[in-house]
A protein has these predicted regions:
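Gly/Pro-rich cap/lid or specificity-loop segments adjacent to the active site
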Residues: 9-223
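Single conserved hydrophobic/aromatic residue that forms the stacking wall/gate
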Residues: 1-11
Length: 270
């Protein structure tokens, strides 16, 4: 069966590193690298299959790396050559991380980061479509934040899209962002309440962790300061199907000998 075969027997992968402008309005200025991986089924190489480019969620996550013949990539490669793009700033596409930005002045950094939004992500895709794969149209799959990229693509370059699949992340068309945030706040409160109802010990552990952070200078493995706000960002896990259990088990392992454990700090950093 395909599951028992090596990935090389199932897929052909072709990697591209492409130089694109940081700012498309000034293409002669600074360039950045964009990494994209073409994944095709070996059995379909003789077919002229269309292209499907995948926009990952996050924002900030790299494109998936196929490690098994399963999931949506298995299904998509039956009908498409799948293009897995590391959106600018992620993965192998001029990644934004502490190492890459540590020498940038604050004002320059703020301007630099402004070029890593959905509008330029789709311009990268257009550059690749036209200059690397030379096709007039292709299809798009957007997951979570990738759905915002897909909608952006539909707004600016609809003539080059065949089909658009969105599995989450649809921006409001006529509502103000504040309305979305107000609705989100209510959802967050409900999620927190439910979390502590299911795992009452987690509430005690969370307070213990918060008190420790408030009273001590805590640093993460990369040197960043662990603030209360950074700790609160773990609530992002409540949006995942198994997130409540994940958080509860993480809080259980937060302390060793009265100090925040290395395991806990590494998980916060992840």
């Amino acid at each position: 069966s395909p599951m028992s075969r090596g990935l090389g027997d199932v897929y052909k992968r072709q990697d591209h590193n492409i130089e694109v402008p940081l700012n498309y309005d000034r293409p002669e200025d600074r360039k950045i690298n964009i990494f994209i991986r073409k994944v095709s089924r070996q059995e379909s190489l003789q077919k002229s299959l269309p292209y499907l480019i995948f926009f990952q969620g996050g924002p900030g996550y790299e494109s998936p790396r196929p490690i098994s013949d399963s999931g949506w990539i298995k299904r998509a490669t039956e009908d498409y050559n799948v293009l897995l793009i590391d959106q600018r700033g992620t993965g192998l596409s001029s990644p934004i991380c502490s190492d890459s930005i540590k020498n940038m002045e604050d004002n320059y950094l703020a301007e630099y980061l402004s070029f890593f939004r959905a509008d330029n992500i789709i311009r990268d895709a257009e550059y690749i479509r036209e200059n690397i794969f030379s096709v007039n149209k292709w299809s798009v799959l957007g997951q979570s934040f990738g759905g915002f990229c897909a909608m952006n693509y539909l707004s600016f370059f609809p003539e080059h899209l065949d089909k658009v699949f969105i599995t989450g992340g649809i921006p409001p068309l006529n509502a103000h962002p504040d309305e979305i945030y107000r609705a989100t706040y209510k959802r967050v409160l409900k999620k927190n309440k439910l979390f502590y109802e299911i795992f009452p010990q987690a509430k005690i552990n969370a307070k213990k962790i918060a008190d420790f952070i408030s009273e001590n200078d805590v640093k993460l493995p990369n040197g960043d300061i662990l603030s209360l706000r950074r700790f609160q960002q773990l609530g992002l896990n409540l949006g995942f199907s198994d997130g409540m259990a994940t958080l509860n088990f993480l809080f259980e392992r937060a302390f060793i000998n009265g100090e925040l454990s290395e395991y806990f700090l590494k998980q916060v950093l992840c």
